[in-house]
Design a protein with these regions (language model features):
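Long amphipathic alpha-helical segments that form oligomerization/scaffold cores
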Residues: 120-151
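A short glycine-rich, His/Asp/Glu-containing loop-to-beta-strand
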Residues: 9-66, 141, 146-185, 192
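Generic beta-strand structural signal
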Residues: 80, 86-88, 98, 112-116, ...
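Short beta-strand segments
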Residues: 35, 65, 90-91, 117-121
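Glycine- and acidic-residue-biased ligand/ion/polar-headgroup-sensing regions
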Residues: 57-77, 83-87, 93-97, 180-182, ...
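Short, structured patches in soluble enzyme cores that scaffold and shape functional sites
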Residues: 117-124, 137, 155-157, 177-180, ...
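Short, Gly/Pro- and small/polar-rich lid/capping loops
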Residues: 1-7
Length: 199
């Protein structure tokens, strides 16, 4: 069955966030329970995102950027800036609090921000697991070019590649950049799958 979902747009302090899941048409896709696209936007000098500390339990968040930078801090003591192509995976498990802010150096000038954050439901057996945070630099992610497509496996397994990101359930999360005449078949090894089209 094919379902087409138009993301709902929210304005968060001058930054547009498009939420595709959950909706009435799809409460989740596989383990993905939230799918948010941030931007694309250019934030003015002296401004940025300021998501204050807030808690999560029983899930994991995955952050991936195409442009810009976000500083992540959490109650485990993690303090990490994510940049384009990197992956931040935060396992909330039995509980974690974190904040996300534009780093000070970025605020010194106009700066772009474009990214995706997904929330993944942990299996019942892992809902109370210890909280954890892992940063994976862009160079550590499997990449391949085929048929005019550039594939980066963010999390899980696809196209014969496996991401170093530790997952708790069968996960398919791949960034695909297509040339104008490129084409790619979606990996069919997953019962539920979706395609989020940026442009």
């Amino acid at each position: 069955m094919t379902t087409i979902i138009a993301p709902r747009v929210h304005d968060i302090g001058g930054l547009q966030v498009r939420r595709a899941v959950p909706t009435l048409q799809a409460r989740s896709v596989g383990p993905f329970v939230f799918v948010d696209q941030m931007g694309p936007a250019v934030l003015g000098a002296g401004t940025g995102i300021d998501v204050r500390p807030h808690p999560h339990i029983g899930l994991a968040t995955v952050t991936f950027l195409w442009s810009g930078a976000i500083g992540h801090r959490d109650t485990l003591g993690s303090d990490q800036v994510i940049r384009p192509g990197d992956v931040n995976w935060m396992t909330a498990g039995r509980g974690i609090a974190h904040s996300e802010r534009t780093p000070p150096v970025e605020r010194e000038h106009d700066h772009p921000l474009h990214g995706m954050q997904t929330w993944i439901a942990l299996p019942r057996s892992a809902e109370e697991t210890d909280p954890a945070f892992h940063h994976h630099a862009a160079a550590t992610l499997p990449q391949q070019r085929r048929n005019g497509a550039w594939l980066r496996v963010i999390a899980g397994r696809a196209y014969g590649e496996e991401s170093p990101v530790k997952v708790f359930s069968d996960t398919l999360n791949v960034a695909i950049d297509l040339d104008p005449d490129g084409e790619i078949d979606l990996d069919t090894g997953h019962v539920e799958r979706s395609l989020y089209i940026l442009e």
